[in-house]
Structures are given as C-alpha cells and as structure tokens.
C-alpha cells in the first residue's frame, strides 16, 4: 500500500484571509508531502505495507527497532494528522454539525460554544509543537485532547478515532500570524467544515 496525501477539495487560496496561500502552499506542498514520503519509506522498511495507517499507529509497540518505530510514529503521525487537518477545512460558510454530532457535543460538552472554547484552550495550552483533537470512541462518546509533536489518540489509547485536528506546529501559522497562535486558532474555526467533521463522526460508530 502506498499512502498518499489527502486530495484537497479546495484551492490553496480558498481559505483566505484566515489561512493564506503561502502558508497552504508550504504546509501542504512541502511539510505534509515530506511526512508522506518519509512514512512510506518507513512502512516499506518495516514490512507493514499491508497495514492501514490506523493499524500501524495503534500498534507501534510491536515494532522492535527503536529508530524505525520513532520514524513510523513521527512521520506516520504527521501523515495521518495532516490528512485529517486538511480534510476538515473548507471555504464554505456557516456549516453545521449533523444532528447526531450536535447531540453528542451537547451531551459531552454542554454546548458547541463550550466545545470550541475547550479546543481553543487545548490548542493554546499545548507547549511547543503539537495538536488539539476532537475524537470519538466506538460508542460515539466524544473526547477533547491535545498531543505533543505528531502524536495522536491512536498512539495514546488505541481506541479513540480523531474526527477533527488543529495543527499548532509553527509551520501551520507562523508565515501569516507570526507568534500570534491565538489569532490563528480562533480563525481556524472560521474555515472548519462541521459537515466534514460530522461524516468523520459517523464513520467511527
């Protein structure tokens, strides 16, 4: 299996002014492309070409070679996390969660407003490089978490599936926002497509 970058359903300039064209070109065209290339090389070396990325990331402890395990973790996480990140954004305005996702959000977080605030605080509170995630278990319960570097919930518990990812590595925002991570995180929600997040949620159950 050759892992490929997610195909964007929008042009690099479509997320302006919230995420600018240069950031998109660099982030998707260079950083994400590099993670994808390096992950494929590590997968081939490990003899895991018959496994899905989810299977690989949730069973990293089975890889005995430390250097190879680190490469799979770092590049596989970078590949998977970026695929999710780029796939849940769009230029569409005013998207809404499905009824099922809305009910789950209200049940597990009290309201959409509470969830957004929690995710923003997680993204801002991540020291250094990392991610904030909204994930679901197989029963549909939602979890808001953060992870360092290219880690994600697959690696940390092996059960919960991320349905939304916020990249807070500096390469995701520094060209446009410089050190103003908070402005970037706030504006991320202006290009977040809740319809896509809802589809991810449905696939978890």
Where do the protein language model's features map onto the residues?
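Feature for soluble, non-membrane regions of globular proteins
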Residues: 1-205
């Amino acid at each position: 299996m050759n892992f490929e970058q997610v195909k964007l359903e929008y042009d690099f300039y479509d997320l302006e002014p919230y995420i600018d064209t240069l950031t998109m070109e660099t982030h998707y065209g260079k950083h994400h492309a590099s993670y994808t290339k390096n992950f494929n090389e590590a997968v081939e070396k490990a003899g895991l070409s018959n496994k899905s990325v989810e299977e690989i990331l949730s069973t990293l402890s089975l890889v005995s070679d430390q250097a190879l395990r680190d490469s799979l973790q770092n590049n596989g996480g970078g590949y998977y996390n970026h695929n999710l990140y780029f796939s849940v954004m769009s230029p569409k305005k005013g998207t809404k969660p499905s009824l099922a996702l809305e009910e789950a959000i209200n049940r597990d977080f009290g309201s959409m407003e509470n969830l957004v605030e929690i995710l923003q605080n997680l993204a801002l509170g991540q020291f250094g490089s990392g991610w904030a995630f909204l994930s679901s278990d197989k029963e549909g319960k939602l979890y808001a978490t953060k992870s360092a570097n290219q880690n994600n919930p697959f690696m940390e518990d092996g059960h919960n599936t991320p349905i939304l990812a916020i990249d807070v590595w500096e390469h995701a925002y520094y060209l446009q926002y410089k050190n103003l991570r908070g402005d970037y995180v706030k504006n991320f929600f202006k290009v977040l497509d809740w319809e896509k997040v809802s589809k991810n949620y449905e696939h978890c159950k």
